[in-house]
Amino acid sequence: MSLKMKGKKYTDLDFVPTISDSEEDVPDLDSDEEKPKPETKGKKKNKSVDEESADMNSGFRFNTDDGEINTNFDGWEFLGDEKDEEKKDVDLDKIIRKKGGLIGMAHVDEAEKSESEESESDDEDLAMDGFGMGAQEQPEGEEEDEDASNSEQESNDEEEDDDEETYDVGDAGDAEEKVEEDTAEEMQAFYAPESESENAKKEVHKTFNDLALSRPVMKGLSNLGYVKPSPIQSATIPIALLGKDIIAGAVTGSGKTAAFMIPIIERLLYKPAKVASTRVIVLTPTRELAIQVADVGKKIGQFVSNLTFGLAVGGLNLRQQEQMLKTRPDIVIATPGRFIDHIRNSASFNVDSVEVLVIDEADRMLEDGFQDELNEIMSLLPSKRQTLLFSATMNSRIKQLISLSLKRPVRIMIDPPKQAATKLTQEFVRIRKRDHLKPSLLFNLIRKLDPNGQKRIVVFVARKDMAHKLRIILGLLGMAVAELHGSLTQEQRLDSVNKFKSLQVPVLICTDLASRGLDIPKIEVVINYDMPKSYEIYLHRVGRTARAGREGRSITFVGEASAERSIVKDAIRGVNDSEIPGSKAVGRNVDWNQVEETNKIVENMDQTVQDILVEEKEEKEILRAEMELKKGENLLKHKDEIQSRPKRTWFQSEKEKKNSKIMGALSKTKKEVNSKKRKRNEAMEDGHKRSYKKTQSDRTADQERTMKKQAKANGKKKGKSKGKR
């Protein structure tokens, strides 16, 4: 049979055919390249040699060591819409430059630079609760000598610092809330037999070849430099390929995204070739994480023919997404709100043929903020589907998981719960009553850690306005900084991430928006400027560094609140409980005199900071006015077309949204609703109007009316008694 006839035979099949022992005549069905034109007989031999050299690099070799990711891999792409013209925005750096900032690292002379490089080991961490000091590569003898020399040089002043760095966290556990755990009977009834998860974790796959994956998927993994599956990938991929539901947890940076993308792409190799439909939905809590997951999938499946991806996230062009979803891509990565919007308002998009649902960062998605959206999505998706849940802190209770309609899921927890990554050094700086010095302390730390701007440093803050203010302060001090939070447009957010990734700006100040899932390679340091609300959020924050076996460092500013000390206690306990060496929890010395000197400069900048904020606000108002003017022109110009569009709908009314937020806030504070309020809420739900509540003036008027009635009654009684006499 000729090669042409064999190719025709395979195209009629709806699945990938098995390759026989003789592979010479099998066409490359997965290649996206065009077929070369036929050549003369004389060139046939040269042609085969050229094709062979093109398919296989002569210098290629299989890497069988323990490395998982190629060091040449530059990370995932964060690309948004492709627009013809860029949207106008306020250039904050230009305003800061006008005020004298962003010229260079301010107030740093050569002597200080050389001193910071030479004495970095002298300002190393104080041992805390039995943890060693110094870098991991130093021999033990050198550590002891360095410790001795440091203790001789740092006399009375350092004794005070020693007291500061000794954390008294003995009473911090009192503030911890008691969390109800699932009973053994509940777990046995809900989850698959424990033997399945234990067998999955015990089975070790040294390479991806042991997982019996198809050649297009293997080619994509090889192109990314993936050789050895991580423990979470080794355990979950075989179970996912069997079509079973999974609840999986592993430390940050362990390859969870690839753990669900690889089996999904492998399954889609066997999809019907002639029927276009959306078969996989991946839900993420943030837009940046969705864009990253889409890029992971595209790069793993780049050699799989006819595999399509769609992105449905907020902040990007709605019409472009609608046009893309019309093609019914195989895999749609979405955020919950925009996903529901497209299901309800995009006529050509439906989810009737969805076979796999993935919820990334599942514990965050199960919180109150996403609960209503998640319930709506579950009601729209087919009940017969495979559901995969992944998170670094997967501690959700069965009561929360019931709403996801899981069918005896296999529970795979690779690492102990609530544990940071290995090779992470966790440092703590006790602030005491010096909160006003935190901006100056942050500047001094960054200057000491990275005087030349060649390291990637992420700074986490609690509030958006603080992130913006810190960007201005550090910019005035000559430091290039980007910010990432919810007040920025999606284009600004992606621009900040890309500039940080390419080291155009070495410092990224962000809220917890960036604490989950984002995998930017070679983040050396994470600084917690504000303490997170919980230890779980802390783990996600520090998980931005020390990823995939690399070393990393986190520095946390700790106040006097019991909740903050409790997080420090949990971090120390996590390191103590860790059986793998490499992670440390230590205190860090700070030269507070130098911080005070920097703070004098920062205080003198207060008026300049306010002037910059005012100028930025004015420019934003001008741009907003221009945008409104352009919007009005478009409404007049395209009036008929705009009015003919159907009105977009949502599954909740404004009143229902408000009630949902109130109930969510009550559940967070754990306040029980008393019987009076409960009856009133029930009456409102039944459609009855709220009864009128008397005011103080109403009660006073009632009292006066009652007194008049009593006076009249008393007068009548007296008149009757006189008549009888």
Swiss-Prot record:
Coiled-coil blocks: 607-686
GO terms assigned for molecular function: ATP binding; ATP hydrolysis activity; RNA binding; RNA helicase activity
Boundaries of every Helicase C-terminal domain copy: 423-613
SUPFAM superfamilies per the UniProt record, alphabetical: P-loop containing nucleoside triphosphate hydrolases
Residues that bind ATP: A250, V251, T252, G253, S254, G255, K256, T257
Enzyme Commission numbers on file: 3.6.4.13
Membrane-spanning intervals of the chain: none
Sequence ranges assigned to domain Helicase ATP-binding in this UniProt record: 237-412
Gene Ontology BP annotations: ribosomal large subunit assembly; rRNA processing
GO terms for cellular component: cytosol; nucleolus; preribosome, large subunit precursor
Keyword set, alphabetical order: ATP-binding, Coiled coil, Helicase, Hydrolase, Nucleotide-binding, Nucleus, Ribosome biogenesis, RNA-binding
Motif range (DEAD box): 360-363
Biased composition, class Acidic residues, residue ranges: 21-33, 117-127, 139-184
Short sequence motif named Q motif, residue ranges: 206-234
Domain remark in the UniProt entry: The Q motif is unique to and characteristic of the DEAD box family of RNA helicases and controls ATP binding and hydrolysis.
Function as written in the Swiss-Prot or TrEMBL entry: ATP-binding RNA helicase involved in ribosome assembly.
Name used for this protein in its record: ATP-dependent RNA helicase DRS1
Species whose genome carries this gene: Candida glabrata (strain ATCC 2001 / BCRC 20586 / JCM 3761 / NBRC 0622 / NRRL Y-65 / CBS 138)
